[in-house]
C-alpha cells in the first residue's frame, strides 16, 4: 500500500457504462473511478477503461444505448479494446489501493445501487473493496426535487455519458447540493441562512 493512503474519510467515486440495465443479461463496457477527500477535492483519477466486447454484443443493445455509445465514442473504444473484465477490475483495485484501504469508503456516485449490482456479478473483488454503504447523489437529487425544487433545478449535468464524465458530474452535483445543506455541509459547505 502506498504512502499516500490515509484516513477513513476519502471517498471512491465510480461509474459504469453497460450494454443495458439487466444484470442477468447485460455487461459492463466501461469503468472509471475518482478518489476525493471528504471535502470533495479530487485527489486522483483512476484508469478510464473500455472493456472489449464483440460487435454482435454492441448491436444487441437497445436503440438508446446504441445511439449514445456511438455518439460518445465508447462504441469504437469498446471494439478497439483488448481489456477484459478481469483486467479492468485488477487495474481499478490496484489504483484504489494506492489511495484508500479496502472497506473504508462507501460506493459514491449517481444511481450507485445499479453499479453495485453489476459489480457484484461481474467484478466481485472490486465490489468488495467498498464499504457496504452507498453515497448515492441520486437520493439527494430526488429529495431536492420534492422538497426544494429550486435547488434541484440549479444544477445541470454536462455529461457525455462516458464513465469518467459521469463520475465528474456526480462530484460536481454533490458540491452543488452541499452548499444548501447548512451545518451538514461541513466547513466548506456554506449554507443558506433563513
UniProtKB/Swiss-Prot annotation:
Enzyme Commission code(s) on record: 3.1.15.-
InterPro entries: Exonuclease_RNaseT/DNA_pol3, Oligoribonuclease, RNaseH-like_sf, RNaseH_sf
A single GO BP: DNA metabolic process
Compartment list: Cytoplasm
TM stretches of this protein: none
Domain of life: Bacteria
GO molecular function: 3'-5'-RNA exonuclease activity; nucleic acid binding
Nuclease listed as a keyword: yes
Residues of the Exonuclease domain: 11-174
Major location (coarse): cytoplasm
Keyword vocabulary terms for this entry: Cytoplasm, Exonuclease, Hydrolase, Nuclease
SUPFAM superfamilies: Ribonuclease H-like
Residues annotated as catalytic: 132
CDD domains: Orn
Enzyme class: hydrolase
Family per similarity comment: Belongs to the oligoribonuclease family.
Free-text function comment from the UniProt entry: 3'-to-5' exoribonuclease specific for small oligoribonucleotides.
Protein name from the UniProt record: Oligoribonuclease
Organism: Xanthomonas campestris pv. campestris (strain ATCC 33913 / DSM 3586 / NCPPB 528 / LMG 568 / P 25)
Phylogenetic classification of the source organism: Bacteria, Pseudomonadati, Pseudomonadota, Gammaproteobacteria, Lysobacterales
Chain's gene name: orn
Amino acid at each position: 500500500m502506498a504512502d499516500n493512503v490515509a484516513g477513513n474519510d476519502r471517498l471512491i467515486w465510480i461509474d459504469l457504462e453497460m450494454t443495458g440495465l439487466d444484470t442477468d443479461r447485460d455487461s459492463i463496457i466501461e469503468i472509471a473511478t475518482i478518489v476525493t477527500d471528504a471535502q470533495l477535492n479530487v485527489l486522483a483519477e483512476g484508469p478510464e477503461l473500455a472493456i472489449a466486447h464483440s460487435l454482435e454484443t454492441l448491436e444487441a443493445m437497445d436503440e438508446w444505448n446504441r445511439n449514445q455509445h456511438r455518439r460518445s465514442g465508447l462504441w469504437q473504444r469498446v471494439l478497439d479494446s483488448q481489456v477484459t473484465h478481469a483486467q479492468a477490475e485488477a487495474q481499478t483495485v490496484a489504483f484504489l489501493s494506492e489511495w484508500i484501504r479496502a472497506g473504508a469508503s462507501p460506493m459514491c456516485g449517481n444511481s450507485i445501487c445499479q453499479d453495485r449490482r453489476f459489480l457484484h456479478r461481474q467484478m466481485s473483488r472490486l465490489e468488495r473493496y467498498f464499504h457496504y454503504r452507498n453515497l448515492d447523489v441520486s437520493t439527494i437529487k430526488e429529495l431536492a426535487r420534492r422538497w426544494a425544487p429550486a435547488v434541484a433545478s440549479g444544477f445541470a449535468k454536462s455529461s457525455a455519458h462516458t464513465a469518467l464524465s459521469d463520475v465528474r458530474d456526480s462530484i460536481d452535483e454533490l458540491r452543488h447540493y452541499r452548499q444548501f445543506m447548512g451545518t451538514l455541509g461541513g466547513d466548506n459547505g456554506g449554507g443558506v441562512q433563513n
